[in-house]
Amino acid sequence: MPIDKIFKDDASEEKGERARMASFVGAMAISDLVKSTLGPKGMDKILQSTGRGHAVTVTNDGATILKSLHIDNPAAKVLVDISKVQDDEVGDGTTSVVVLAGELLREAEKLVASKIHPMTIIAGYRMASECARNALLKRVIDNKDNAEKFRSDLLKIAMTTLCSKILSQDKEHFAEMAVDAVFRLKGSTNLEAIQIIKKPGGSLKDSFLDEGFILDKKIGIGQPKRIENANILVANTAMDTDKVKIYGARVRVDSMTKVAEIEGAEKEKMKDKVKKIIGHGINCFVNRQLIYNFPEELFADAGILAIEHADFEGIERLGLVTGGEIASTFDNPESVKLGHCKLIEEIMIGEDKLIHFSGCEMGQACSIVLRGASHHVLDEAERSLHDALCVLSQTVNDTRVLLGGGWPEMVMAKEVDELARKTAGKKSHAIEAFSRALVAIPTTIADNAGLDSAELVAQLRAEHHTEGCNAGIDVITGAVGDMEERGIYEAFKVKQAVLLSATEASEMILRVDEIITCAPRRREDRM
């Protein structure tokens, strides 16, 4: 009985060589798509949404580009997933991981065409991956015992991460900001305490780091503009009185006096609620929902700063940094945890008024205010800065660093080549192929900078045959240079994640020998 008779209508399958080719082609297409964004001279892509408003994103972040694509090919989806995981785990290397996985599959395609079994290729790739990782471990730099040198390493890593982004022109300024912000976290990798606020206007150079928390709200009329030693109640509760109008209920009354009585009763109810809130011993009340005029007047009379309609992310972060909890009921003041800070005041950034909380309970809190020409510039600046913050927070925990500019790939390729010479059998072809795939990263960096990649990579290979060589590609001068002298550093954790994720993804795709596309379940099938 033919296999296709087992499947329902609309289901399809591809077997053997066709399935493998479909997987390879899809993965290589995704790799080629993001390849041009790699390196300091990588180009940006414009992503235009087909939805309402046709939103436009301008970016060169691999993960952002791939997340925005609607992909049909299953192997391509695997590469999109590894890029997302790389972004979540370490923040940088999202393009490198896809390019390396694509190159490994390109090499594997040639080996399969030479009648080498996929399992032999996988075994060779595993050996090569382990050898490459060990080569990096031998050459890591670790300055965790020297605070000054370690800070310098972090600055260099931040500048390397930012040099391929929109912030490259002011990378020193933003690297300083990112390192200062990460040091305030005191070893934590929770970036929630670092708030990024985007305000159009000015230039990227006008961006600054502020110690404390900034809430994008104005202080109401008649409210105190400055409060010292603040006790803050963060809440998510309805502060409106006119329930009858809101819920569309109807009340029949025989005189206007009765209407006045209903309104009076609602006002009394609101007075009681405000009294309970004031009874917590607070001088600042921040609410997720609207605060109507009447309760706002009551708070102003009591000398309490009332902030309404704070966005949910804003109040969650405010609760976190001030040490408070979000409350919804106010009958038991002793069970409500209040937030504390030394000073609340109104500040101006550009044309906008914002509320600044300084001296917060959580000392790690800080805000980065980004200025820029447009929302597109600010969105890309935020993504770039977030990548740098992720890499730095990971490096504070795993303090090992490496040189950059294609140096790690050449070190790994040299060791893997030596392993290939010592290995007998067909596996040695797979190990050699792994080495060629590694060299594709410095080749792409040089190509994207408009340099002669064949010449530069040949020069690099020759340089790396001397022991302890620090040579890499310097795209600014367009020549091979000493990466230590140029101050081009990368985090070991990023490189390790790129190597292991790309190898595992290519392994997974290599194992495929059949793709079965299932038909969607029809409505009657679900009954």
Curated annotation (Swiss-Prot):
Matching SUPFAM superfamilies: GroEL apical domain-like, GroEL equatorial domain-like, GroEL-intermediate domain like
InterPro entries: Chap_CCT_beta, Chaperone_TCP-1, Chaperonin_TCP-1_CS, Cpn60/GroEL/TCP-1, GroEL-like_apical_dom_sf, GROEL-like_equatorial_sf, TCP-1-like_intermed_sf, TCP-1_chaperonin
Domain of life: Eukaryota
Keywords on record: ATP-binding, Chaperone, Cytoplasm, Nucleotide-binding
Location in the cell: Cytoplasm
GO MF annotation list: ATP binding; ATP hydrolysis activity; ATP-dependent protein folding chaperone; unfolded protein binding
Gene Ontology, cellular component aspect: chaperonin-containing T-complex; plant-type cell wall; plastid
Cystine pairs: none
PANTHER family the UniProt entry points to: CHAPERONIN (PTHR11353)
Protein family per UniProt: Belongs to the TCP-1 chaperonin family.
The protein's role, per its UniProt record: Molecular chaperone; assists the folding of proteins upon ATP hydrolysis. Known to play a role, in vitro, in the folding of actin and tubulin.
Assembly behavior: Heterooligomeric complex of about 850 to 900 kDa that forms two stacked rings, 12 to 16 nm in diameter.
Protein name (database record): T-complex protein 1 subunit beta
Native species: Arabidopsis thaliana (Mouse-ear cress)
Taxonomic path: Eukaryota, Viridiplantae, Streptophyta, Embryophyta, Tracheophyta
